[in-house]
């Protein structure tokens, strides 16, 4: 990067954005250290595959609903940091909690605490990022944050592999060690500052009152969210891509290596593609990413060699960089300022529920018709979403 590029980065990425990005990096190191370990550990202590599925389903559903609720609460208070602090704290302490007992109820409680922490912080954190950007710089801000977050997601599994080599099957030790980067993320949160913003105009309500945002949302927001949720209904868990990798290669280490490659490409590409989105328009970059998504799932469908698998994971990283960060920027540009966290929370709650349904649907297709049919179906539906945005969504450079 030349001097002009460096000073441009410093101008866009202020202290708050940098700190939030570092917080996410360490939090993701902690979470992703356990991502490849938890399913194996649960089977070791006697969990059936069904019980593992129920556990993850309950934990993720908790996170899904809580994102909208706590996002709206954050807007009502006109504050972000209390939700960010408590959210990261709960996720950090949940990791070493797993080492304490092997009772199913305790494991359920620990995983639910972790996901509740994610639900607490997500909308408030993204609203805080939005407050520290302009419509012209949001894609870069969210892209930078995602790049740091995803770098942590690459470091975490690599550390897990190292610890499993050094301390085979010593899962309690790994859970305790995962608490260290988690607590570092909590410590960094306390260096953040914010100004209280005007409170939400939606008024208070019950746990599900964040759904009322749909009534006051702009037509552009509604069109965007409809398209994103159709995509989410087929965008199933990455575990299916790892299963396909294991099916093709027969090697767990290659599967984890491919997942690390995906995260590294994602981390490296997120900021440059965010900068490109700020320059040429969010919609153009997003649709390019959506086309890559279809290509990736087609490649996984035809894959019969590690070369195709690793190529698909690399392209998948570019897709994620072209969509995940800038989607949040897109949504916040369309939200009413005092309801930003509610707008994010509404979308992320609905997206999480759709993703859970997508995993169930993909699992059924996989079992009934084979892996290739499931993967081709996802590719086909993503192309339908691509045409939806081309035909029905209109926006300018900052709204798509």
What role is predicted for each listed range?
Residues 2-14, 195-227:
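Juxtamembrane intracellular "pre-TM" segments in multi-pass secondary transporters
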Residues 10-63, 220-258:
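Helix-loop boundary and gating motifs at the non-cytosolic
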Residues 40, 44, 155-173, 357-373:
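Transmembrane alpha-helix termini and helix-breaking/packing motifs in multi-pass membrane transporters
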Residues 66-78, 164, 269-282, 366-367:
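Helix-to-loop junctions at the C-terminal end of transmembrane segments
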Residues 82-96, 179, 284-299, 379:
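Structural signature of the two symmetry-related core transmembrane helices
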Residues 110-151:
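Cytoplasmic helix-loop-helix junction between adjacent transmembrane helices
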Residues 172-190, 375-391:
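Symmetry-related core transmembrane helices of the 12-TM Major Facilitator Superfamily/SLC fold
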Residues 181, 189-203, 390-400:
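Helix-loop junctions on the cytosolic side of multi-pass membrane transporters
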């Amino acid at each position: 990067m030349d001097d002009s590029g460096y000073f441009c980065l410093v101008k866009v990425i202020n202290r708050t954005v940098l700190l939030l990005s570092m917080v996410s990096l360490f939090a993701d190191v902690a979470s992703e250290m356990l991502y490849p370990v938890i399913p194996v550990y649960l089977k070791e202590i006697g969990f059936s595959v069904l019980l593992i599925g129920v556990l993850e389903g309950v934990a993720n559903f908790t996170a899904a609903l809580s994102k909208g609720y706590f996002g709206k609460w954050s807007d009502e208070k006109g504050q972000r940091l209390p939700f960010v602090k408590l959210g990261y704290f709960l996720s950090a302490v949940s990791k070493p909690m797993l080492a304490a007992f092997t009772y199913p109820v305790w494991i359920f409680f620990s995983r639910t605490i972790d996901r509740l922490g994610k639900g607490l912080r997500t909308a408030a954190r993204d609203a805080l990022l939005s407050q520290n950007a302009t419509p012209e710089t949001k894609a870069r801000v969210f892209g930078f944050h995602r790049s740091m977050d995803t770098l942590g997601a690459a470091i975490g599994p690599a550390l897990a592999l190292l610890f499993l080599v050094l301390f085979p099957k010593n899962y309690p030790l790994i859970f305790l060690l995962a608490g260290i980067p988690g607590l570092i993320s909590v410590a960094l949160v306390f260096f953040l500052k914010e100004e209280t913003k005007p409170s939400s105009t939606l008024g208070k309500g019950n746990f599900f009152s964040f759904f009322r945002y749909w009534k006051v949302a702009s037509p552009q927001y509604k069109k965007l969210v409809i398209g994103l949720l159709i995509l989410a209904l087929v965008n199933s868990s990455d575990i299916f891509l790892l299963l396909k990798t294991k099916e093709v290669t027969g090697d767990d280490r290659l599967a984890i290596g491919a997942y690390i490659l995906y995260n590294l490409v994602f981390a490296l590409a997120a900021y440059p593609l965010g900068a490109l989105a700020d320059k040429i328009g969010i919609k153009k970059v997003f649709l390019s990413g959506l086309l890559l998504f279809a290509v990736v799932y087609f490649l996984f469908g035809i894959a019969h060699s590690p070369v195709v698998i690793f190529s698909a994971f690399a392209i998948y990283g570019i897709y994620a960089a072209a969509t995940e960060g800038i989607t949040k920027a897109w949504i916040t540009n369309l939200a009413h300022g005092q309801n930003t966290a509610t707008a994010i929370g509404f979308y992320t709650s609905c997206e999480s529920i759709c993703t859970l349904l997508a995993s169930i649907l993909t699992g059924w297709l996989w079992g009934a018709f084979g892996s290739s049919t499931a993967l081709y179906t996802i590719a086909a539906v993503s192309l339908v979403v691509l045409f939806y945005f081309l035909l029905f969504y209109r926006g300018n450079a900052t709204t798509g």
